[in-house]
């Protein structure tokens, strides 16, 4: 009888199974890692442990992976399925030498020497019983629950107390064939493999648990002893004519107001609550790109998460996802408005640090906050902040606030040793709880102050909210970014470290816009966002079911065949499935008559649904512009369409944070896809097939309101070439209100003054504003914008501008 089949061993496994709940990272190793089911597989573990292998066995049974108890058969010879780097630690004395474990590596390498076709995958597996990073002063707790190399007695205690928080993490497989071919098969290579494995497990533990937590008061005193803080305190005392002790006391109060007080115990409790909450709210949370972030952590990067801000749920969602993806929840920069009882203390113990809306005029507060942020980076804590500064009320990304990004970049300039990397994160929901409140605020109602009653009110309304989406965008490593933007930045700083570089502000602004662009690059297309985009482009927000299905299938085909970026995700299924999901979530309305089903958006929900449309409108705005050219312009050639797109793209880019690498290639690919879909023909010029006209008109409707805004602006510019920027913004907004009243435009962003401000800044940058040297360009773009509008809308704009000009 084998050891694992003995009654004693089975009894131990049965007891452990009752005590242990295991979370697997990643959830699907075959999909997220480079595992090949057709190649033999061997697990590499740090320490030989009966309980660890038993926990791994439960996971492998669940995932359909080879059992750790099942030996590997290599051409009739048996090899171990699990290779450990070191032996178990005895209760007393030292663990045995590593010769036995090195022999396991040597046997596997020798098998590759004998069998040239053999290619075993070595898969590192890390096991964690709880994820407490430990504190600088918790030596007693560490003695009882020492996690790195526990004895069997300590392991029993860990299983009893932390068994419900067991994590099994698989890492990328390594080819043993590659190692044998490149480095040989002798004992020296086995030793190297074991050494590499030890380093891997050490780094992996730090990714999973994070750095040791400092004592909060000791941290405060250490921060106040830094040279920069001493200088700031002295300046505060001199400027306010107070004692240094009083200034120091003020600095300590600021630190107490700002600093997080991370508690692993609270995080474990919150994890259980949030698991219940997400299961109650959502049918699932879709995640894309987590593996690249795990790798950045593993490689020693200081990670700064910069998500978009849709809802108060964002704070919880990203931390929860990172926890379950085997990473430490970040320290989150939260607005001081969220520091209300009892949520504030709970957020603080969950990792939140609080930030005032404005630092202006308060040099001591600025110095304290900067020093605290530097300390987070220096100690290796990941950080999260929202660059928009507040939640988007329209579903579009807001213009970035650059304060936190500037502070992060300044930390790099002051010499943070580890590479600091910004990770843009797209957060999306099939239902945002605050949408109704947002539209009340947009219509003039005063914003409610956050309180515990709002939280209770939100929880009371819990229901089926569909799915959530977390997509990690393309990371931006700040050292590389600085090298790209200012190649000589190190030399300049070395010459005068105290002087603010003249290039810093434009470099920060460019970085902030790049972050926002990469958030949008990682957008998630869902059933709700896509159906709302289609229906809101129709005349009555309603379509026949068959027509809606056909249109959704077209959009899905465009998004998958010509992907916006490699970071974008597109919902699985066809148009029929997307409609069914929308109906289930009560976002769509179904009416039936003898001629068939009609799918619509209820009038009471129409404005709210613009929020979801706006989440992804940037993904289909270029296809929509192309469709406008094809349906509104006679004998449109490929070159003419490309020229039209190039005219409007700078404004679209500024408004929607778009970042298409090669615009001309992208337009050509979209045109080729429309040809492949059978909607158009090409013979020097494009012609629309009769069967494709309705689909293209509907696609063109997505950019309709945007083109109306551009037509307003360029008609005003053409009539008054030297118009001032403030006057253009005011007149554009006034004309938009008139146009909306006459043609029933209800989308909130159509009347957004800030949007016209963004466009006017871009126009000035392009040289179109207050400069008649570009009058020919303005006239051309005005003509193109007018040609893409319905005749009634065009006439309203032309007549209104003429009346304005004559007044």
UniProtKB/Swiss-Prot annotation:
GO terms for biological process: CDP-diacylglycerol biosynthetic process; fatty acid metabolic process. It comes from the Bacteria. A motif (HXXXXD motif) lies at residues 308-313. It is found in: Cell inner membrane. One of its GO terms (molecular function) is glycerol-3-phosphate O-acyltransferase activity. It catalyses: sn-glycerol 3-phosphate + an acyl-CoA = a 1-acyl-sn-glycero-3-phosphate + CoA. Its EC number is 2.3.1.15. One of its GO terms (cellular component) is plasma membrane. Pathway: Phospholipid metabolism; CDP-diacylglycerol biosynthesis; CDP-diacylglycerol from sn-glycerol 3-phosphate: step 1/3. Its main location: membrane. InterPro entries: GPAT/DHAPAT, GPAT/DHAPAT_C, GPAT/DHAPAT_LPLAT, GPAT_PlsB, Plipid/glycerol_acylTrfase. Keywords: Acyltransferase, Cell inner membrane, Cell membrane, Lipid biosynthesis, Lipid metabolism, Membrane, Phospholipid biosynthesis, Phospholipid metabolism, Transferase. The HXXXXD motif is essential for acyltransferase activity and may constitute the binding site for the phosphate moiety of the glycerol-3-phosphate. PANTHER family: DIHYDROXYACETONE PHOSPHATE ACYLTRANSFERASE, GLYCEROL-3-PHOSPHATE ACYLTRANSFERASE. Belongs to the GPAT/DAPAT family. This is Glycerol-3-phosphate acyltransferase. It comes from Shewanella loihica (strain ATCC BAA-1088 / PV-4).
């Amino acid at each position: 009888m084998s050891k694992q089949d003995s009654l004693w061993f089975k009894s131990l496994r049965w007891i452990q199974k009752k005590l242990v709940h295991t979370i697997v990272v990643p959830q699907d190793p075959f999909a997220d890692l480079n595992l090949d089911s057709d190649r033999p597989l061997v697990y590499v573990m740090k320490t030989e442990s009966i309980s660890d292998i038993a926990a791994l066995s439960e996971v492998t049974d669940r995932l359909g992976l080879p059992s750790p108890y099942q030996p590997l058969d290599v051409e009739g010879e048996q090899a171990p399925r699990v290779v450990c780097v070191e032996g178990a630690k005895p209760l007393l004395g030292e663990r045995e030498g590593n010769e036995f474990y090195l022999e396991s590596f040597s046997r596997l390498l020798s098998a590759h020497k004998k069998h040239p076709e053999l290619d075993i995958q070595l898969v590192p597996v890390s096991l964690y019983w709880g994820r407490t990073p430990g504190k600088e002063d918790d030596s007693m707790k560490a003695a009882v629950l020492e996690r790195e190399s526990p004895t069997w007695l300590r392991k029993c205690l860990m299983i009893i107390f932390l068994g419900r928080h067991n994590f099994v993490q698989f890492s990328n497989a390594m080819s043993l064939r590659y190692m044998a071919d490149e480095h040989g098969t002798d004992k020296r290579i086995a030793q190297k493999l074991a050494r590499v494995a030890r380093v891997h497990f050490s780094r992996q533990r730090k990714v999973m648990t994070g750095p040791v937590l400092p004592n909060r008061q000791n941290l405060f005193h250490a921060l106040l002893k830094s040279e920069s803080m001493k200088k700031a305190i002295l300046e505060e005392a001199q400027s306010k004519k107070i004692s240094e002790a009083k200034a120091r006391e003020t600095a300590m109060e600021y630190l107490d107001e700002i600093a997080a007080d991370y508690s692993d115990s609270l995080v474990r409790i919150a994890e259980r609550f949030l698991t219940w909450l997400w299961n109650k709210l959502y049918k699932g949370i879709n995640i894309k790109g987590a593996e690249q972030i795990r790798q950045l952590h593993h490689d020693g990067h200081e990670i700064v998460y910069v998500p978009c801000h849709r809802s108060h749920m964002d704070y919880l969602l990203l931390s929860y996802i990172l926890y379950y993806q085997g990473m430490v929840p970040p320290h989150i920069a939260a607005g001081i408005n969220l520091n209300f009882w009892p949520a504030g203390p709970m957020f603080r113990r969950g990792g939140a640090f609080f930030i005032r809306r404005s630092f202006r005029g308060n040099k001591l507060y600025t110095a304290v906050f900067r020093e605290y942020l530097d300390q987070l980076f220096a100690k290796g804590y990941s950080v999260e902040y929202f660059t928009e500064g507040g939640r988007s009320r329209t579903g579009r990304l807001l213009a970035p606030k650059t304060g936190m990004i500037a502070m992060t970049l300044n930390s790099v300039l002051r010499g943070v040793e580890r590479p600091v990397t910004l990770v843009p994160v797209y957060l999306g929901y099939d239902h945002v709880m605050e949408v109704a409140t947002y539209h009340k605020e947009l219509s003039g109602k005063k914003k409610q102050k956050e309180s515990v009653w709002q939280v209770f009110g939100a929880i009371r309304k819990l229901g089926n909210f569909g799915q959530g989406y977390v997509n990690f965008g393309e990371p931006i490593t700040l050292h590389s970014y600085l090298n790209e933007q200012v190649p000589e930045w190190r030399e300049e700083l070395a010459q005068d470290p105290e002087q603010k570089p003249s290039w810093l502000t434009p470099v920060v602004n460019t970085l902030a816009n790049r972050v926002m662009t990469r958030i949008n690059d990682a957008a998630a297309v869902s059933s709700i966002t896509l159906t709302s985009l289609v229906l809101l482009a129709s005349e009555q927000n309603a379509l026949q079911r068959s027509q809606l299905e056909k249109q959704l299938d077209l959009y899905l085909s465009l998004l998958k065949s010509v992907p916006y970026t490699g970071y974008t995700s597109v919902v699985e299924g066809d148009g029929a499935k997307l409609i069914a999901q929308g109906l289930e979530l009560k976002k769509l309305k179904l009416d039936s008559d003898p001629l068939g089903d009609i799918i619509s958006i209820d009038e009471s929900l129409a404005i709210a649904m613009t929020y979801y449309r706006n989440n992804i409108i940037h993904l289909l705005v270029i296809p929509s512009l192309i469709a406008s050219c094809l349906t509104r312009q006679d004998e449109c050639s490929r070159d003419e369409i490309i020229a039209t797109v190039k005219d409007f793209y700078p404004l679209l880019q500024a408004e929607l944070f778009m970042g298409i690498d090669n615009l001309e290639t992208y337009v050509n690919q979209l045109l080729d896809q429309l040809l492949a879909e059978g909607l158009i023909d090409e013979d020097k010029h494009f012609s629309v097939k009769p069967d494709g006209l309705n689909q293209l008109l509907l696609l063109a409707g997505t950019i309709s309101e945007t083109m109306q805004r551009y037509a307003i602006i360029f008609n005003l510019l053409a009539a008054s070439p030297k118009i001032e920027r403030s006057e253009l913004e005011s007149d554009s907004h006034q004309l938009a209100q008139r146009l909306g009243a006459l043609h029933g435009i209800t989308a909130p962003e159509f009347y957004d003054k800030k949007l016209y401000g963004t466009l006017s800044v871009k126009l000035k940058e392009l040289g179109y504003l207050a400069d008649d040297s570009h009058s020919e360009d303005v006239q051309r773009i005005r003509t193109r914008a007018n040609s893409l509008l319905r005749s009634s809308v065009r006439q309203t704009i032309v007549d209104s501008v003429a009346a304005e000009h004559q007044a």
